[in-house]
Each structure stands twice: as structure tokens, then as C-alpha cells.
Amino acid sequence: MNFEGLHAARVFMGDSLGFHIIFVMFGLTLPILVSWFEWMGIRKNDQKLIDIAKFWSKIMTVLVITGVISGTIIALQMSLVWPGILKFGGEVIGLPFMFETYAFLIEAVFLALYMATWNSKKVSKKMHAVIGLFVVLGSTLSAYAITSINGWMNSPSGFSYVNGNIVNVDVVQAMFSDTALVEFFHSMPAYYFAVSLVVAGLYAFKVMRAKHKDRLTKRFKIDWFIIKRLMFFAAAMFVLLIITADITGKYLAKHEPEKLAAIEVVRETQTNAPLILGGVATEDGRIIAPHIKVPSALSILAGNSPSAEVIGLNEFEKENQPPLVVHTFFDIKLTLIAVLVAILIAFFGAYAFKPKLLANKVLLFSVGISGYLAIAVIELGWMITEIGRQPWAVRGYLTTAEALTKTNDITTFGYLFPFSYLVLFIVTILAVRRIIKDESKNNGVKK
């Protein structure tokens, strides 16, 4: 396979995963939000909240279905384009694939039961809400299984490698490795954070379309109730993200040092390593364009001390060093996070000190777009994770080139994957818009 074929295959896979992660984050978060809305409605004896839960459950069902289709496309792509990964590690990662299947069955069965028993006289409201919790359970277990596979690719464990063969396989260790746990507990709050902001933003846009004098009236009481609850939930998830990000940084410094070195363009192993913000990294590791160096900050983040050693890229063979473009992606990610922090501060500042400012059009618009900025942050995070593993498909054992199919037709049939995702994305948008359009004014966000 020539370089053009390898590059095309990576582009196709990146495109597929970029679309897939959007379906995933909604498929994981909406079950939690729907259950939360329903339980609040039951506790407060508020039919409007229950109706909102029912409204979002319809959208949730669409996104779960499209997520399944998306996942199937990914599985086909893995088998057809990257057969080397399964050939090399199938014996190790077979368990999480099987686990994911059973978890999905739990999710699918209880989702069908959940949707079929809305307003059923044979199922109490509390029992119906309990059924919804099993949907949450199934989706969460499914997410862990798939995340553990990615974690294994980033830091393989659970086997011995003797004479080019995998032996002494411990599938449990591979599935519940430190890498899997770190990735899972960092990515899940990120999904909850982003989707809760998207939903809050839709209600914010709804309020914003009204006249200024009407925005804080009883007409939008339920909308403000949802917005405030979701913004508090998002803030809680953001605090959790700060904690897990710190853990992730320290984990990278110890277990994937070349990735951290590429992110911060650390050429030589050093203590008192600075954190570099901004700039563009050249191939030889120089930083051009305006940038800021925060003295010793990277060492502190990596090991809680300025004297903590940060391993540099020169410790690794040139061909095994990750692309330095991850530094640019990380800077963009930090910039978007700073914008999101500003939006959260503005919202809670207005909420605490001057509630009338909540009706401000600029603030409502900022809340409205915040979820999409958060989605961009997640996309960038996964890009850093995956590109930062290059040139490896399974770090240290199997290169991306070795994992690629030997067929020369990748540039011919490969275009089917982005085309399929484009069609799926359009169909999903149309289906969700139809649900919103058909919903009554009192049952959710209006178009």
C-alpha cells in the first residue's frame, strides 16, 4: 500500500470517527437527561416536566438508532480497511467487543420497553422511570467496553509478546486497564457537559426569540427551570473534567510520554519543563509564531513538582514520534475551553448577582452556542488522542501501515464511508427536526 492509500484510509477513518462520536455523546447523555427530567416530574408532580422527558425520549430514540447504524459502519470499516488490528489483537480485545454486544442488548430491550410504556395504565410512573435507568445502564456499559478497546490500542496490556506472537492473554486486565479507566472517566463527563449545554442552548434560543420584556415572565418558567438545572449540571461536569484532565496529564507523562511531549513540543528530557501556549511547531521541534511559555508548568502538571522530569521526543526514534500538529489542536482546544469558561462565569454571575441580565440577548446567544463549542472541544480531544498515537495502530506493536488492508482499492471504495455518514447525518437532522416540528408548544423546544 502506497503512502497515498494509507493517507486516504486515515482520512476516511478520521471522518467516520468524527461523525460517530457526535452520535455517541448524544446516545449516552440523553438517556440520563430524560431520566432526570422524568424523575423531577414525578417528584414535583409536574406533568410538564414529564412531557418534556417524553419529548426528548423521542429524539433520544432517533439518536440511539443512528448511533447503532454509525457503529455498524465503523465495525465494517475496521474489518475491511484495518484488518491488521483484529488479526493482531483479536484474542485480547474479543471480550470487550462481546461485552459491548450484551450491553447494547440491555439498552435496546429496555429502550423499546421504555418507549412502549409511556402513559401505560399497566406501568406506574415510577416503574417507567426505573426502566429508563436500565437504558442508562446499558448505554454506559457499552461505552466503557468500546472505550477500553481504544485504551488498549493506546497502551496495550493483558498479554505477553514472545517471538512475534501474543501469549499469556489476560482479557480482564486488558479490558480494565488503567488506560481504559482514565479514558472512560475523562470522556464521559465531557459528553455530559457538551450535550447538557446543547439542550440548555436550545431552550436559551427559544427564550431569546421572544421580546425582551417577556423573557423572564411565567411564559418561560419551565424553560428557565430546564436551562438553570442543565447549566448547573454542566458546571458540575466541568469541575469533574478539570480533575480527570489533571489525572490524564499525569497518566500521559508516565505511560504515553511521547504523546505529551508532542502536545507541548518537548524535544529534550528535562525538569522545570515549561507549558507552551500558542505558536506553531515545525518539523524540527521549533516553535514559530507568537507563543507564551509558562515556566515549570508542564513539570508541575506532569508530576506535581517543578523538578518532575518530562521525557522529550528525542528519546524516541524519529519515525516513532507523533505528528507535532497535535500542539496546534491542543491550543485550539484550550482556546475554546476558555470561551466556555467565560460563558459559564457570565451565566452564573448574572444568575447570582443580577438575574435580569439572564434575559440579555448576547448571554442567551452565548449559552445557545456553548454546546456546539463543547462538541468541538471533544472532537479536538479525540483528534489529539488518535493522532498523538501515530505512527502506531496498537502502540509499540503494530504500526498504522501494518494494520492497513493490503488491497489497492481503498481510494475507490473508501469514499463510501464518508458518503454514508453524510447521508446518515442528514437523515438524523431531518428526523429530529420532524419531531420538534410535530411537538406541541408546551412539550419542549420549538423550531
Map each language-model feature to its residues.
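Polytopic transmembrane helical bundles with strong interfacial aromatic enrichment
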Residues: 1-447
